[in-house]
Amino acid sequence: MLSEEGYQNLFRQLDAWLFEHKRLWDVQAFHSLELPWLETDPELCQWLSCHEGIPSSDQVEAALLRFLPSFAPMQWNWKDLTQPDVLVEPSSHFKAGIKGRKWSQIEAFSRSIQPTSEVVEWCAGKGHLGKLIAFQHQCAVHSLEWQASLCEAGQAEASKRQISQRFSHTDVLKGEGKSALCDARSAVALHACGDLHSTLIEQAIEASVQYLAISPCCYHLTKSSNYRPLSLAAQAACTHLSQDNLKLAVKEVVTAGAREQRLKDVELAYRLGFDALQRHALQQDSYLTVPSCGKALLNDGFAAFVDWASQQKNLSFKLSSEALQEFESIGYQRVVQVQKVECVMQYFRRSLELWLVLDRALRLEETGYQTLITMFCDKAITPRNILITANLRA
């Protein structure tokens, strides 16, 4: 287990490394018609342009080592969390109505923590995690959720199974969870987004909660336009993060099916084709953001997408079918370029995520907690598999 000093040293090394290579990950992949590193790293761009297909992370690392003389990769020595010797396995009907991958996340999270009563389940939804914790760890659980209908459904299920779990209809962002934390010894949050998990950290510190287990998610879901660090170490860091950087930290899709991935590729091609069209027609060289669209629109073809996107931006283009085909083709060509840019950015994704996780761990360390950062499951179950556990020092 790393000490606070150990986490601080790791954070400083990581911060310096990310700052040194910021030009490689702090870019807008689809805003430029050219590779964004033509001036700074022409050999890397030449390699990307000539590479057949999308490079793997290992291939990107090899290219960075080859073309950037000062580059050295960061190495992480992740610990495998030791599982408790005995946990009571729930009956199969316990997971009824919960999708397989979600249930696997809940099981893995519960196996990886050691809470004591009373446990606050933060942003509980229907309280599936809380039910398993109450059952396996023999703890009383207080589940906080802002949607009343989910509270009602969760309470009905807990009563049916005679689980020691109660629900409160609570808006934690308005401070309504403070009293529950003051009465609790433990608090848990599985994939609470952005401001939700950072609010838990701050309010748990204030309430002197003895034990915390948090798997952070969606750091970009915050009111702030730029990232506001939690710890003193991150506040003094060289690396400053925008909303786009925060999105990159969690931009890893390992669960998309073939159909879902195909639709994403088609939508990206249509958006990039429309972008090329509007740049040409309006004689300007900047990306034009278009709102999200319904997936059904993609089945109607590129011409229908252009009509829809034009209406969204109050534009009108008169184009022949040949011209539309040309811009659609450009869109698909640009998809390959964007994917190559993103593969370089993705190489730094996990490091950005760890920077954010360390910020949270250091905030807890600075306020009297002993923290541990681990992975609670394989990334095939969920890419957001990092767990922060914290015990308040005596």
Predicted features along the sequence, with ranges:
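Conserved class I S-adenosyl-L-methionine
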Residues: 117-125
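Conserved SAM-binding strand-loop segment of SAM-dependent methyltransferases
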Residues: 162-172
